[in-house]
Amino acid sequence: MKNKIKSLCLIKKKKSGRSRGKISVRHIGKKHKKFYRKIDFKRDKYNIKGIVESIHYDPNRNARIALIKYLDGEKRYIIKTNNLEISNFVVSSLNKISLNSGNSTIIKNINIGTLINCVEIFPKIGGIFSRSSGSESEIIFKDNKFGVIKLPSGIKKKISLNCMATIGKICTFNVKKKLYKAGQNRWRGIRPTVRGVAMNPVDHPHGGGEGKTSGGRHPCSLWGIKTKGYKTKKK
């Protein structure tokens, strides 16, 4: 792992879940300071080959990033895909190219059944879908104007054939999910969560009662929205 490239980094100010002094998002506090790496999600440097110079760690995402040095001297970060190693070449184009891992082109030029990542939902806005570690989408149908992709969640999405996508699956690595101390959550900006049954009735629908008993209602949030399987997404 190499050190960051300062010209490709930004200082991102933390809001800590506050909006003008008032808590707008609960359970969020100050986190460890880190630089934001500018990732090339648009892949709009067309028909210029680039070589993978090094692999970097990015604290803002759970996938590794690759530093690409193009033949004209410009450097950009992209999300590392499987089988993309140092000294490999990548290219982005609107025309047909070899479907190697890390290359980027429009959906029109990609075969059905190919695994892709960093998929645009509208042309020229940058990759939106399948950007986290180990994620992938699959092209399952194409016609003259549109294509259908299957997202990691199983949802099928209809998009334009002019949307860009990167070939391959996002790289995976072992992520330690076990927390050895409470401070590890504070590093991530996560504050403690108080249970509703431990509150007073004025603070939560589950509050009050004698001992550990509370009102006999279904599990719900602070604002009375049902939880435990209740779907909130509108179709």
Swiss-Prot record:
**Region Disordered, residue ranges:** 197-218
GO annotation, biological process = translation
Identify the GO cellular component terms for this protein: large ribosomal subunit
Q: Which UniProt keywords apply?
A: Ribonucleoprotein, Ribosomal protein, RNA-binding, rRNA-binding
| GO terms assigned for molecular function | rRNA binding; structural constituent of ribosome; transferase activity
Q: Name one Pfam family in it.
A: Ribosomal_L2_C
Kindly give the InterPro entries that the UniProt entry links to this protein.
NA-bd_OB-fold (IPR012340), Rib_uL2_dom2 (IPR014722), Ribosomal_uL2 (IPR002171), Ribosomal_uL2_bac/org-type (IPR005880), Ribosomal_uL2_C (IPR022669), Ribosomal_uL2_CS (IPR022671), Ribosomal_uL2_dom3 (IPR014726), Ribosomal_uL2_RNA-bd_dom (IPR022666)
What is known about its subunit structure? Answer: Part of the 50S ribosomal subunit. Forms a bridge to the 30S subunit in the 70S ribosome.
Entry function? One of the primary rRNA binding proteins. Required for association of the 30S and 50S subunits to form the 70S ribosome, for tRNA binding and peptide bond formation. It has been suggested to have peptidyltransferase activity; this is somewhat controversial. Makes several contacts with the 16S rRNA in the 70S ribosome.
Q: Which family does it belong to?
A: Belongs to the universal ribosomal protein uL2 family.
Q: What is this protein called?
A: Large ribosomal subunit protein uL2
Species name? Carsonella ruddii (strain PV)
Gene encoding the protein = rplB
